[in-house]
């Protein structure tokens, strides 16, 4: 992957010529004589400085893509905050980007700098199929993720129960199979050297039917599905936020924290943590009056037993919130029906308090889960938007060429620029996760700096 080694390999390949028997089959034009010897390399379209510069830039892009996506895989598999089943989609998507960087980009760079295909006819077909496969799998992954987001928003309880790791893995297998079906045609219809070409070339089928079908299947149809699904998600989320705000009014029920603009309570902030539930309960007027009445009865009973038992009762207890419980415990130690009544009231108070704590805790957990779901949905929307921005220029210009040919053909340098911008997308997803998701950011820091600290200690 290092750029000096890649540049040296390109120079050696240019001096050597096409490999094996394919040189006679593919390169028998003006660049070779009848016997296939004294092969002359094509005139390079880049200077030596440009070759070194491009090799360095693309080499850095390859290394950055591999390292970033490997970090994504490690983070999802090791971080407790990222171990949700739906994050397996991100592992598979990162794997596709790693394969693009290792199996496609180096050969695309060599083909670009050498101005001919050096690696033989068989690998040409495999290379083209892998190129289309990984690009198609990326967008089909994003399409499956958008459907997963939609079902988790519209059928939260039912779908979350069904979304097990096994189901997610089965969906990922289906995504790769669909991508393979779409990318299979290059294996049987890849582009061969046109008549009169002096040097072997490797390109996709140039017929209109293939250009349009591959563009629709690999890009435009999944993009349409993603756009419709995310528009529906936005409408559902907006309607749900409006309904909640109308129900709550200016103040939330039961003293709940006010909501922010995105419908999340302050207790479930950006870091996904809840404020600890309060143990004190603010009862209504009737329950307060009832508790005062019980406290007075217990206090009077305690005074009557004070001389015999030496017990001070609950009159000087720590506070009104705990006086009833302490009085109940004091009375429960005395015999008679009053003790049984006090014991029952103590149990009812404790049950009431524990039930309120459990209710607040469950609400808190639900808010944290909703906050994470919303952040995850937003991050994936950014990922999809960046993917479309990177690949749309290439697919639009490519399909335009398939329709009107030379009349709509872009200048070759611009078309190649669009082509490489699409490859750059494979390196951007880890950056997006780092910028927009705190769980990924924290996990990346943990992976990188914890291991570095261990190395310093050793």
From Swiss-Prot:
Bias (Basic residues) ranges: 291-303
Presence of the UniProt keyword Transport in the record: no
TM ranges: 52-76, 89-114, 125-147, 169-191, 208-231, 380-403, 417-437
Site (Implicated in catechol agonist binding and receptor activation): 214, 218
Keywords of this entry: Cell membrane, Disulfide bond, G-protein coupled receptor, Glycoprotein, Membrane, Receptor, Transducer, Transmembrane, Transmembrane helix
Site (Implicated in ligand binding): 131
Annotated stretches, region: Disordered: 245-343
Spans within the Extracellular topological domain: 1-51, 115-124, 192-207, 404-416
GO terms for biological process, alphabetical: female pregnancy; G protein-coupled receptor signaling pathway; negative regulation of uterine smooth muscle contraction; platelet activation; positive regulation of MAPK cascade; positive regulation of neuron differentiation; positive regulation of phosphatidylinositol 3-kinase/protein kinase B signal transduction; positive regulation of vasoconstriction
Mode of membrane association: Multi-pass membrane protein
PROSITE patterns the record matches: G_PROTEIN_RECEP_F1_1 (PS00237), G_PROTEIN_RECEP_F1_2 (PS50262)
Locations listed in the record: Cell membrane
GO molecular function, one term: protein heterodimerization activity
PANTHER family with a match to the protein in the record: ADRENERGIC RECEPTOR-RELATED G-PROTEIN COUPLED RECEPTOR, ALPHA-2C ADRENERGIC RECEPTOR
Stated family: Belongs to the G-protein coupled receptor 1 family. Adrenergic receptor subfamily. ADRA2C sub-subfamily.
Protein name (Swiss-Prot/TrEMBL): Alpha-2C adrenergic receptor
Species of the source: Mus musculus
Lineage, uppermost ranks: Eukaryota, Metazoa, Chordata, Craniata, Vertebrata
């Amino acid at each position: 992957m290092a750029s000096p080694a890649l540049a040296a390999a390109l120079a050696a390949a240019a001096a050597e010529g096409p490999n094996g028997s394919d040189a006679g089959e593919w390169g028998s034009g003006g660049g070779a004589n009848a016997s296939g010897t004294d092969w002359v390399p094509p005139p390079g379209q880049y200077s030596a400085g440009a070759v070194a510069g491009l090799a360095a830039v693309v080499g850095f892009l390859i290394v950055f893509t591999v390292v970033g996506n490997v970090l994504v895989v490690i983070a999802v598999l090791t971080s407790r905050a990222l171990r949700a089943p739906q994050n397996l989609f991100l592992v598979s998507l990162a794997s596709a980007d790693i394969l693009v960087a290792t199996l496609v980009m180096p050969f695309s760079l060599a083909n670009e700098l050498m101005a001919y295909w050096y690696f033989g006819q068989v690998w040409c077909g495999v290379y083209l199929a892998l190129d289309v496969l990984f690009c198609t799998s990326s967008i089909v992954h994003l399409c499956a993720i958008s459907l997963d987001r939609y079902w988790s928003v519209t059928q939260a309880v039912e779908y979350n129960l069904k979304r097990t790791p096994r189901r997610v893995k089965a969906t990922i297998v289906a995504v790769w199979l669909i991508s393979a079906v779409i990318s299979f045609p290059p294996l049987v219809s890849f582009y061969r050297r046109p008549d009169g070409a002096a040097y072997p070339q490797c390109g996709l089928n140039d017929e209109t039917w293939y250009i349009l079908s591959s563009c629709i299947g690999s890009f435009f149809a999944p993009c349409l599905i993603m756009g419709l699904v995310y528009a529906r998600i936005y409408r559902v989320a907006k309607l749900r936020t409006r309904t909640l705000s109308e129900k709550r009014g200016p103040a939330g029920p039961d003293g709940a924290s006010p909501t922010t603009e995105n419908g999340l309570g302050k207790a479930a902030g950006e870091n996904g943590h809840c404020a600890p539930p309060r143990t004190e309960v603010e009862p209504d007027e009737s329950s307060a009056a009832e508790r005062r009445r019980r406290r007075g009865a217990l206090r009077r009973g305690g005074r009557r037993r004070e001389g015999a038992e030496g017990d001070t009762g609950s009159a000087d207890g720590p506070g009104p919130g705990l006086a009833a419980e302490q009085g109940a415990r004091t009375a429960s130690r005395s015999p008679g029906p009053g003790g049984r009544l006090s014991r029952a009231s103590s149990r009812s108070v404790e049950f009431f308090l524990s039930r309120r704590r459990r209710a607040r805790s469950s609400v808190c957990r639900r808010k944290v889960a909703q906050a994470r779901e919303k952040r995850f949905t937003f991050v994936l929307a950014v990922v999809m938007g960046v993917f479309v921005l990177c690949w749309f220029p290439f697919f639009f210009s490519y399909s335009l060429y398939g329709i009107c040919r030379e009349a709509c053909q872009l200048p070759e340098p611009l078309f190649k620029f669009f082509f490489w911008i699409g490859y750059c997308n494979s390196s951007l997803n880890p950056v997006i996760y780092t910028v927009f998701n705190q769980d990924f950011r924290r996990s990346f820091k943990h992976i990188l700096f914890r291991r570095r600290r261990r190395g310093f200690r050793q």
